[in-house]
Amino acid sequence: MGETEKRIETHRIRCLSKLKMFLLAITCAFVSKTLSGSYMNSMLTQIERQFNIPTSLVGFINGSFEIGNLLLIIFVSYFGTKLHRPIMIGIGCVVMGLGCFLKSLPHFLMNQYEYESTVSVSGNLSSNSFLCMENGTQILRPTQDPSECTKEVKSLMWVYVLVGNIVRGMGETPILPLGISYIEDFAKFENSPLYIGLVETGAIIGPLIGLLLASFCANVYVDTGFVNTDDLIITPTDTRWVGAWWFGFLICAGVNVLTAIPFFFLPNTLPKEGLETNADIIKNENEDKQKEEVKKEKYGITKDFLPFMKSLSCNPIYMLFILVSVIQFNAFVNMISFMPKYLEQQYGISSSDAIFLMGIYNLPPICIGYIIGGLIMKKFKITVKQAAHIGCWLSLLEYLLYFLSFLMTCENSSVVGINTSYEGIPQDLYVENDIFADCNVDCNCPSKIWDPVCGNNGLSYLSACLAGCETSIGTGINMVFQNCSCIQTSGNSSAVLGLCDKGPDCSLMLQYFLILSAMSSFIYSLAAIPGYMVLLRCMKSEEKSLGVGLHTFCTRVFAGIPAPIYFGALMDSTCLHWGTLKCGESGACRIYDSTTFRYIYLGLPAALRGSSFVPALIILILLRKCHLPGENASSGTELIETKVKGKENECKDIYQKSTVLKDDELKTKL
């Protein structure tokens, strides 16, 4: 008996360690996939400026990830469970690495980035011809011949980013459905929420790392190492600045490939957690069942697909949960993807600072919320109906708190000729002819070049020329323009490069907004695990993998793909001034109407999320009357344990009977 117990204990430890190894590996996979995703979302503004494309096209590039995911999600979700799940996940990680590498390629295939400017590097181009020169001619930085512009290769280099994002989406497909179903299959019923909470925590650590990496890369000039950064006349707060977006994609590619390695050494199946000590007792029974299943799969691997789809489609709670998810994903995809741009435009900070603050204030509370949510589910053994109520009412509380963000606003940047007159009076409608005034009408200034300067009167101007500046001192970012006839101040009128700061009040509003965002993130993350358990428990155990995959499919199709596109188009509609390329074509937007931008960024998600509570309340009503298939999961485990105990009792009876017989034989012989 001692050897048998030792062998069973060894087997238990080995199986337990393999499950823990899978948990560690899948958590790392969630870290790597969310690292890549958050980095991509954070670099949207940099990509927009690098390729001089509108926000709607950037939204399409961002949504292309979902297209790649859709190509495989149903196939992987259903057939993946019939194959070797850990190996499928490992292959997916490698493919994600390939996609990230493809996204970095344009940097190595195109020329150096050139931003629009009237100012030369030395500040002494043709005797300061970029300044106001009455009865003169503006000599701008050299432009290409129009015939050469049409042949410029970099105009379509964004296609590499598009294709790379599609490939990354294809690679990420197996991680969520196969990883979650693997945990559900082999973890204890009461441990499953905690394990999923830990995995989801990895999905928060990844974005935190991704945002920190993005913040660093956004602060490094795109062509660092190839140009002298001391000669730059723009800073990270300038809307023409482009960070080293390509560098982070290379790091993401390496991380994804390294994450794939452990999955190739993990088993496809494990004994149910908690029953490993009795593995030998039920070993033969499991082997017989597995042989029968293999035979069935060989001759009809697809026979259950349509019945499963029909069963899920006729499950009202499952379908309503998908509807809630689609509506809320439309809101959150937009908020997360364009939050750095919102912080830049609303509060006047750099892309690097916006990304950093977004990560520091939002992700730690979400991480803590996921862990606490999982612990609550485990500690108090929350039922599905209780979990649904917790998820719904916490989401409603966070939703009401969200409306306070409408109060934390800053005024538009006052740019003369766009939203402010030369007298400093705000104007609502931008008219191109309004950029000229008596003070600069004879300066022969270009009307479309975005090269802003900040006057010592607190107003910004499109360029030093339009500010009426006649002289300059200094070079690079330290250049100061003097004798500016359009700047109405007492004494010497002067201006410096860049837009004027929005002031200390705006910085205070930014802090309030970030604190509110952190509170909202924590409350909403508390509801995430209970809500996800409703999804898992409203399906039969054999339908879970397909159900999770179909849920992901629907959120991708109806939220992940269209949301960034229509949201980006709405943002483009608030643009006040577009950048100008060498040949006169429109580039990326340089400044938005921050008031309208705020109403779109905050108002549209508020409307979407508000409508999602209607199907959520219907779910609560249905749960009062329905008996969910997942509620039998624990009883299924208990049945197995009862069966095992029954077999153990049979073994004890046989052993006792044999002992009695041996005693009788011994007495007879004596």
UniProtKB/Swiss-Prot annotation:
Gene3D superfamilies: MFS general substrate transporter like domains (1.20.1250.20). Higher expression in the brain than in liver and kidney. Expressed in brain neurons in both cortex and hippocampus. Expressed in placental trophoblasts. Also expressed in lung and testes at lower levels. Expressed in the eye (at protein level). Expressed in the retina in the outer and inner nuclear layers, the inner plexiform layer and the ganglion cell layer. Expressed in liver and prostate. In testis, primarily localized to the basal membrane of Sertoli cells and weakly expressed in Leydig cells and within the tubules. Expressed in fetal brain and liver. It comes from the Eukaryota. InterPro entries: Kazal_dom, Kazal_dom_sf, MFS_dom, MFS_trans_sf, OATP. Residues 433-488 form the Kazal-like domain. Keywords: Cell membrane, Disulfide bond, Glycoprotein, Ion transport, Lipid transport, Membrane, Transmembrane, Transmembrane helix, Transport. It catalyses: taurocholate(out) = taurocholate(in); glycocholate(out) = glycocholate(in); taurochenodeoxycholate(out) = taurochenodeoxycholate(in); tauroursodeoxycholate(out) = tauroursodeoxycholate(in). It is found in: Cell membrane; Basal cell membrane. Pfam families: Kazal_2 (PF07648), OATP (PF03137). Disulfide bonds join C439-C469, C445-C465, C454-C486. Transport activity is inhibited by the grapefruit juice component naringin. It is a multi-pass membrane protein. Optimum pH is 6.5 with estrone 3-sulfate, taurocholate, prostaglandin E2 and L-thyroxine (T4) as substrates. Changing V220I: In a colorectal cancer sample; somatic mutation. Residues 1-20, 81-86, 185-203, 268-311, 378-381, 537-545, 624-670 are cytoplasmic. SUPFAM superfamilies: Kazal-type serine protease inhibitors, MFS general substrate transporter. Na(+)-independent transporter that mediates the cellular uptake of a broad range of organic anions such as the endogenous bile salts cholate and deoxycholate, either in their unconjugated or conjugated forms (taurocholate and glycocholate), at the plasmam membrane. Responsible for intestinal absorption of bile acids. Transports dehydroepiandrosterone 3-sulfate (DHEAS), a major circulating steroid secreted by the adrenal cortex, as well as estrone 3-sulfate and 17beta-estradiol 17-O-(beta-D-glucuronate). A conserved histidine residue in the third TMD (His-107) may play an essential role in the pH sensitivity of SLCO1A2/OATP1A2-mediated substrate transport. This is Solute carrier organic anion transporter family member 1A2.
